[in-house]
From Swiss-Prot:
Belongs to the chaperonin (HSP60) family. This is Chaperonin GroEL. The keyword Transferase does not apply. It comes from Photorhabdus laumondii subsp. laumondii (strain DSM 15139 / CIP 105565 / TT01). GO terms for biological process: protein refolding.
Length: 548
C-alpha cells in the first residue's frame, strides 16, 4: 500500500480553499450577460470556446493533490446543479465559493464548524421557502422565450425557437438539439408518432416524386412475430380489401412468400399495403408495439396473450388518419386511440421513468412518452464554424433545460435579485447559539455574491449597485445588458425557480462539508528515481549465461 500524505486543521483548509478559488475564479468569469469566454485546450483539433460553467469546471485538474480535492468538491456542486436543473452551474459555484471563504474565516476566528454548518443549513431551508413564495408560474410563450433567451446568454433567436418548439409539441414533448448544416438556426417538428423503421420493399412506394409511401385512413396490423407464410395473412387481407382501405403491417419482420405476395397485390392494385419492421428490440419492441396499439386503438397480435394471426379480424386492427413511410422512418399521424387510454399509458411510462436507475433506459422511456403525447421537435443549430457550433449547441442545451425547469416550478426575478430579496426576508432568522447566527450571516452574505459577480463581469462597481438593489423592493434590480435599473420580470430577466433553488441547496450542502473538514489524506508522490535505481540493479542477471 502506498504511503499517504496527511494534513490537519488550518494547513488542510488553506490548501483546499486555494483549489476552490482556482476553479471558482475560472468558472465565475462566465456569469451574466456580459460574462467572458473561456478557451479550453483539446488534445486534438481546435480549442473549444465556452461560456458554460460546468464545461469549464469539468476541464480543471490541479497538480497539487490537496488543492485538487478542493477543486473537485466545487466541481461536484456544478455537476449536481447541472443534473438537477440543467443550468445554474456558475451561480452554484459562486455561492459555494462565497460560503466556503466566509465560513473558513469564521472557523479560523474560533467558531465551532458544526454550529456554522447548522446555521448555514437553517438559512438555506428558510431561503428556499421564501423563494417558493416569490415564484411566478411560467406558462405562456413570452415568458418561456424570455427564460430561454437569458439562459442562452441573451440570444433572442434561441429563446423564440424553444418557445415555438414547446408550443408545437407541448410542455411534455421531446425537444432535441442537433448540429445543423446551415448558418441559421432551424426548427423541425415531427407531428404524430415517428419511429426509425422504413418500408421493407421499394415496390410499396406510391409517391415516386419524394420516394415515400402515403396511406390515407389506413388499417394497422400489429404483429409480435415474423411473418413468412401468406396463408396467415389472408383473412385480414380479404377483410381490408372488402373495406376498400389501405393496410400497414408492423411486424418483427415480413419475408419470403408473404412479402412477395404483398408486393404483387400492391402493384396490381388489388390491396394497397405497406409493411415495416417493428421498432426497437426485445422487450422494448413489445412495449413500443403496445404504444402504437394504444395510439391507434388496435390490438397487438401476440401468441403470448392467445391471439393468432389467422384468427385476427378488422376489430383487432388499429386505425389512423394518415401514415407516411420513407426509406428510414414511419410516421403515424392522428391515431384514433382513446384519449383516456393514451393518458393512462403515458402515466404508466412516467412511473417507469421514476423507478428507472439507468440514464439510457430513462431517455428511451421519455422518447416513448413524447411520441404518445404529441410529437418530437428538433432544434438544428446553425453556425459559421465548428468551434462556434459546439459552443452554441451547449448554450441551446442549457436554455432548453432552463425552460423545462421554469415550466416545472415557475420563475423568479433574474440577475441575482431573487437571492438578494430572499436574504432580506430571512434577516430576522436566529440560530440556537451565536456560532449558528454567524453561519446564518455567512449564507446571507453568499446570497449577494451572484449579483456582485454579474456586475463585476459587466465592468461596473459591485458594492454601489448591490446597495442600490438592496434599497429597492420586489423585482427591482439591475439589468447588466442595458446598464439600467427597473423591474426585472417586466424587462424579461427571469431565472427558473428550480435553477436558483438547486444552485443554493447544492452549494450550501458541499460548502458545509468543506467547512467541517479537519483532515485531508492523499497518496504521496512516487519517487521515480528510486524505481529506476531498483530496475537498474537487475543488469547483473546478464551473467547468468555462464550457467549453461
Amino acid at each position: 500500500m502506498a504511503a499517504k500524505d496527511v494534513k490537519f486543521g488550518s494547513d488542510a483548509r488553506v490548501k483546499m480553499l486555494r483549489g476552490v478559488n482556482i476553479l471558482a475564479d475560472a468558472v465565475k468569469v462566465t456569469l451574466g450577460p456580459k460574462g467572458r469566454n473561456v478557451v479550453l485546450d483539446k488534445s486534438f483539433g481546435a480549442p473549444a470556446i465556452t461560456k458554460d460553467g460546468v464545461s469549464v469546471a469539468r476541464e480543471i485538474e490541479l497538480e497539487d493533490k490537496f488543492e485538487n480535492m478542493g477543486a473537485q468538491m466545487v466541481k461536484e456542486v456544478a455537476s449536481k446543479a447541472n443534473d438537477a436543473a440543467g443550468d445554474g452551474t456558475t451561480t452554484a459555484t459562486v455561492l459555494a465559493q462565497s460560503i466556503v471563504t466566509e465560513g473558513l474565516k469564521a472557523v479560523a476566528a474560533g467558531m465551532n464548524p458544526m454550529d456554522l454548518k447548522r446555521g448555514i443549513d437553517k438559512a438555506v431551508v428558510a431561503a428556499v421557502a421564501e423563494l417558493k413564495k416569490l415564484s411566478v408560474p411560467c406558462s405562456d410563450s413570452i415568458s418561456i422565450a424570455q427564460v430561454g433567451t437569458i439562459s442562452a446568454n441573451s440570444d433572442e433567436t434561441v429563446g423564440k425557437l424553444i418557445a415555438e418548439a414547446m408550443d408545437k409539441v407541448g410542455k411534455e414533448g421531446v425537444i432535441t438539439v442537433e448540429e445543423g448544416t446551415g448558418l441559421e438556426d432551424e426548427l423541425d417538428v415531427v407531428e404524430g408518432m415517428q419511429f426509425d423503421r422504413g418500408y421493407l420493399s421499394p415496390y410499396f412506394i406510391n409517391k415516386p416524386e419524394n420516394g415515400s409511401v402515403e396511406l390515407e385512413n389506413p388499417y394497422i396490423l400489429l404483429v409480435d412475430k415474423k411473418i413468412s407464410n401468406i396463408r396467415e395473412l389472408l383473412p385480414v387481407l380479404e377483410g381490408v380489401a372488402k373495406a376498400s382501405k389501405p393496410l400497414l403491417i408492423v411486424a418483427e419482420d415480413v419475408e419470403g412468400e408473404a412479402l412477395a405476395t404483398l408486393v404483387v397485390n400492391t402493384m396490381r392494385g388489388i390491396v394497397k399495403v405497406a409493411a415495416v419492421k417493428a421498432p426497437g428490440f426485445g422487450d422494448r419492441r413489445k412495449a413500443m408495439l403496445h404504444d402504437i396499439a394504444v395510439l391507434t386503438n388496435g390490438n397487438v397480435i401476440s401468441e403470448e396473450i392467445g391471439l393468432e394471426l389467422e384468427k385476427a379480424t378488422l376489430e383487432d386492427l388499429g386505425q389512423a388518419k394518415r401514415i407516411v413511410i420513407n426509406k428510414d422512418t414511419t410516421t403515424i399521424i392522428d391515431g384514433v386511440g382513446e384519449e383516456d387510454a393514451i393518458k393512462g399509458r403515458v402515466s404508466q411510462i412516467n412511473q417507469q421513468i421514476k423507478e428507472s436507475t439507468s440514464d439510457y433506459d430513462r431517455e428511451k422511456l421519455q422518447e416513448r412518452v413524447a411520441k404518445l403525447a404529441g410529437g418530437v421537435a428538433v432544434i438544428k443549430v446553425g453556425a459559421a464554424t465548428e468551434v462556434e457550433m459546439k459552443e452554441k449547441r451547449a448554450r441551446v442545451d442549457d436554455a432548453l433545460h432552463a425552460t423545462r425547469a421554469a415550466v416545472e416550478e415557475g420563475v423568479v426575478a433574474g440577475g441575482g435579485v431573487a437571492l438578494v430579496r430572499v436574504a432580506a426576508a430571512i434577516v430576522g432568522l436566529k440560530g440556537d447559539n451565536e456560532d449558528q447566527n454567524v453561519g446564518i450571516r455567512v449564507a446571507m452574505r453568499a446570497m449577494e455574491a451572484p449579483l456582485r459577480q454579474i456586475v463585476d463581469n459587466s465592468g461596473e462597481e459591485p458594492s454601489v449597485i448591490a446597495n442600490s438593489v438592496k434599497a429597492g423592493e420586489g423585482n427591482y434590480g439591475y439589468n447588466a445588458t442595458t446598464e439600467q435599473y427597473g423591474d426585472m420580470i417586466a424587462m424579461g430577466i427571469l431565472d427558473p425557480t428550480k435553477v436558483t433553488r438547486s444552485a443554493l441547496q447544492f452549494a450550501a450542502s458541499i460548502a458545509g462539508l468543506m467547512i467541517t473538514t479537519e483532515c485531508m489524506i492523499t497518496d504521496l508522490p512516487k519517487d521515480d528515481k528510486a524505481d529506476l535505481g531498483a530496475a537498474g540493479g537487475m543488469g547483473g542477471m546478464g551473467g547468468m549465461g555462464g550457467m549453461m
